[in-house]
């Protein structure tokens, strides 16, 4: 059994009388791994309490410490912006990156939703729905200068007139019970109505006027008859 360090409990010479060769063995041969420690159960350690490390281990440990220290010592000024990342050309990224060339995000920043991006997406979605939504006939405005848009089927709704429109139509009917096409167009443009609506209103107004005149004439005729009978 050979050992890499001297054990004082083990005799310095063999029973066969040969010379002591344990002291001639090198403590650290060429195949010794400096990174792997040996347990203390092999014997009392007479070597000084010193750690032998290789230069490559120093370089590796420094880079590891730099990475760990950089993740805690970075402030707000060390973060890269999106413009810096997007402006960098891909051809210029051939050099090896250091530990500080990468972005560092906290878990809250990684999983936190971006309110501005979501608000912009919702706004664009709302505008798309606004222009692509179908317009049904019942959604159109009936009192419009361009005319009411009705469906190809179904019953047309009854037109309602404002007090101003009714007053102006009554004035026109008082002077002219029948309108020419030119005058009808002028009134339609002035009252924000269609020619058809003006035409229908005058037709209904003439029917009402005829009924009123017939009722007046009938009452006058009945009154004259009663007076004639009373005179006899």
From Swiss-Prot:
Query: Is Amino-acid biosynthesis set as a keyword in this record?
Result: no
Q: Name one Pfam family in it.
A: Homeodomain
GO MF:
DNA-binding transcription factor activity, RNA polymerase II-specific; sequence-specific double-stranded DNA binding
Q: Which Gene3D superfamilies match?
A: Homeodomain-like
Extent of motif Antp-type hexapeptide: 135-140
Positions of the region Disordered?
A: 88-126
Q: Which domain of life is it from?
A: Eukaryota
DNA-binding residues (ranges): 154-213
Task: List, in alphabetical order, the GO biological process terms annotated in this UniProt record.
Answer: anterior/posterior pattern specification; embryonic skeletal system development
> For this UniProt entry, what's an example GO CC term?
nuclear speck
Q: What compartments host this protein?
A: Nucleus
Tell me the SUPFAM superfamilies matching this sequence. Homeodomain-like
Keywords of the record: Developmental protein, DNA-binding, Homeobox, Nucleus, Transcription, Transcription regulation
Q: What does this protein do?
A: Sequence-specific transcription factor which is part of a developmental regulatory system that provides cells with specific positional identities on the anterior-posterior axis.
| Family label | Belongs to the Antp homeobox family.
User: What is this protein's name?
Assistant: Homeobox protein Hox-A6
* Species of provenance: Mus musculus
Q: Which gene encodes it?
A: Hoxa6
């Amino acid at each position: 059994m050979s050992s890499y360090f001297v054990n004082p409990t083990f005799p310095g010479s063999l029973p066969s009388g040969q010379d002591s060769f344990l002291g001639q063995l090198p403590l650290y041969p060429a195949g010794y791994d400096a990174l792997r420690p040996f347990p203390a159960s092999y014997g009392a350690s007479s070597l000084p309490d010193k750690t032998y490390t290789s230069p490559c281990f120093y370089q590796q440990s420094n880079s590891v410490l730099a990475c760990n220290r950089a993740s805690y010592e970075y402030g707000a000024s060390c973060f890269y912006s999106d413009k810096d990342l997007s402006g960098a050309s891909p051809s210029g990224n051939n050099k090896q990156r250091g530990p500080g060339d990468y972005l560092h995000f906290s878990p809250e920043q990684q999983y936190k939703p971006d309110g501005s991006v979501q608000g912009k997406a919702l706004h664009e979605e709302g505008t798309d729905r606004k222009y692509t939504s179908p317009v049904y006939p019942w959604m159109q405005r009936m009192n419009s200068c361009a005319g009411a848009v009705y469906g190809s089927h179904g019953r047309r709704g009854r037109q309602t007139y404002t007090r101003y429109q009714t007053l102006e139509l009554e004035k026109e009917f008082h002077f002219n019970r029948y309108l020419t096409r030119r005058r009808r167009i002028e009134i339609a443009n002035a009252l924000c109505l269609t020619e058809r609506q003006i035409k229908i209103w005058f037709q209904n107004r003439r029917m009402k006027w005829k009924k009123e005149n017939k009722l007046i004439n009938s009452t006058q005729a009945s009154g004259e008859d009663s007076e004639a009978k009373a005179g006899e």
